[in-house]
């Protein structure tokens, strides 16, 4: 196989592994998963003549900005919302009857392809993934190559997750103190951004 997918026990997130150009297995992170799904949905709707002016997609503020590049280049409205699917569901609800939601997700592997569930849904995401893999195969490509095509067309992004562990009671107190400090002395600039 070229791809493997798995879902979490409560069936709301899907994880993907695929082979790269060297035949090595690589894990597709949540940002890449959301990017692949939205790229395919948009490209497929355009190819089928189903894209409409009132279509929109949603991502959370912590999800890759490459999705904005895909949306902008394809003239589709993209909304940023707070982290958590309740906020994505809120955007769908606010536009119900006025605009058509076509997909959305977040970097924590949650994705929603249709608007009838209103929460992340690994079952529909797995179905969508199978469709994307078949579409890629029809083009003579792997899932990994589709991801590379996205990077060539829209730009490349690389991220790394760093977990900082603060164990025990002293760790909890240290975290609490850090959060209180952030609230009372918010940074004026982060990474050169104001």
Report the location of each language-model feature.
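Phosphate-binding and adjacent anionic-ligand microenvironments
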Residues: 2-3, 24-26, 44, 48-194
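Short Gly/Thr/Asp-enriched flexible loops that form oxyanion-binding sites at enzyme active sites
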Residues: 12-30, 67
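Catalytic or ion-translocation cores adjacent to nucleophile or general acid/base/metal-coordination motifs
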Residues: 29-41
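N-terminal small/polar loop signature for handling phosphorylated ligands or for N-terminal nucleophile
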Residues: 1-16
């Amino acid at each position: 196989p070229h791809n493997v997918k798995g879902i979490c026990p409560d069936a709301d997130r899907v994880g993907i592994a695929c082979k790269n150009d060297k035949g090595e297995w690589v894990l597709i992170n949540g940002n890449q998963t959301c990017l692949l799904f939205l790229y395919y949905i948009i490209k497929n709707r355009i190819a089928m003549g189903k894209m409409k002016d009132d279509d929109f997609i949603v991502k959370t503020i912590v999800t890759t900005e490459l999705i904005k590049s895909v949306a902008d280049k394809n003239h589709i409205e993209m909304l940023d919302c707070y982290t958590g699917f309740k906020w994505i569901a809120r955007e769908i609800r606010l536009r119900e009857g006025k605009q058509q939601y076509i997909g959305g997700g977040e970097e924590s592997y949650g994705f929603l392809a249709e608007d009838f569930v209103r929460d992340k849904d690994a079952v529909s995401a797995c179905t969508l993934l199978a469709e994307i893999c078949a579409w890629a195969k029809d083009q003579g490509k792997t899932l990994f190559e589709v991801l590379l095509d996205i990077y060539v067309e829209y730009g490349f992004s690389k991220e790394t997750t760093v977990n900082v562990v603060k164990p025990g009671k002293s760790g909890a107190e240290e975290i609490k103190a850090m959060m209180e400090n952030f609230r009372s002395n918010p940074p004026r600039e982060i990474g050169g951004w104001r």
